[in-house]
């Protein structure tokens, strides 16, 4: 049985700003683009969240909800420096680390000798070390299954942790709302509920063939997660084939300007992850992914040896205009595929 820890920093970008400027600690604060440039919120602190401000929300909407919101453009060098320090702390416990973004990662500590082999104690020690060395708080989830560790990390936020033992998995899944499964947003959850599927137990009782017919590949993923099946390995840097970043949206978008703002938000994150790749790796292809409100997924990519925002924006617009067919979009993603000239095969760095 595996021991997986998911560590998620608490409102990371905003937390770095509050650490470096204590005057920001108790006021609504968000990191994001300006309203005039149709910006999008990247991160909001907890005082801002009380007003309903959330990540991926248009800045204009955030300012309507919280007119006195303090908006900062972000200091990504500072966030990257803190993220590298956090990653080094993880490496003291295991080499099996899969970063999902600058502020969260999976750790496989199944064979780690630290803390007498206790994943619970390791998570507690990691969180305390992060606070001692960076004055930032983290939350953690511990479970034998990858996606359950991610769900668990959100159950005792901020600055807490939650454990799902192997014996607790069946009972936990039985009552788990489908909207808690990573990748199942509010719109999808509402559609599933309209079909009588509200919890994992409802899906457990469903026919897999019927789910596949209605939802395609998503139906299989939904069925497997509801059964507690998630065999995905922790992908360390040397195993990864691509760099990508994506965002599942709280509400479907129907205007190109909204999609353009999401691409603008995601691009700096893609740049940062690409910069972490070994220098002998170069780009083979880059592309865009859109998921529509009928669960269909489309990707479009082409050969392009250098990362370029304008090229990705053009690809996104072409995909939007040619393949959307009036449908709402619930997920936007950017990715590059990497080529290793030394061994002539693709390697990965996932998000």
Swiss-Prot record:
Active-site residues, as the UniProt record annotates them: 104
Species of provenance: Cronobacter sakazakii (strain ATCC BAA-894)
Reaction(s) catalysed (UniProt annotation): DNA(n) + a 2'-deoxyribonucleoside 5'-triphosphate = DNA(n+1) + diphosphate
Cofactor note: Binds 2 magnesium ions per subunit.
Positions bound to Mg(2+): 8, 103
Annotated protein name in UniProt: DNA polymerase IV
Signal peptide: none
InterPro entries: DNA/RNA_pol_sf, DNA_pol_Y-fam_lit_finger_sf, DNA_pol_Y-fam_little_finger, DNA_polymerase-Y, DNApol_IV, IMS_HHH_1, Rev_trsase/Diguanyl_cyclase, UmuC
Pfam families in UniProt: IMS (PF00817), IMS_C (PF11799), IMS_HHH_1 (PF21999)
Biological processes per GO annotation: DNA-templated DNA replication; error-prone translesion synthesis; SOS response
Compartment(s): Cytoplasm
Role according to the record: Poorly processive, error-prone DNA polymerase involved in untargeted mutagenesis. Copies undamaged DNA at stalled replication forks, which arise in vivo from mismatched or misaligned primer ends. These misaligned primers can be extended by PolIV. Exhibits no 3'-5' exonuclease (proofreading) activity. May be involved in translesional synthesis, in conjunction with the beta clamp from PolIII.
Enzyme kind, highest EC tier: transferase
Requisite cofactors: Mg(2+)
KW DNA repair (keyword) present: yes
UniProt GO molecular function: damaged DNA binding; DNA-directed DNA polymerase activity; magnesium ion binding
The family this protein is said to belong to: Belongs to the DNA polymerase type-Y family.
Keyword set, alphabetical order: Cytoplasm, DNA damage, DNA repair, DNA replication, DNA-binding, DNA-directed DNA polymerase, Magnesium, Metal-binding, Mutator protein, Nucleotidyltransferase, Transferase
A GO CC annotation given for this chain: cytosol
Matching HAMAP family: DNApol_IV
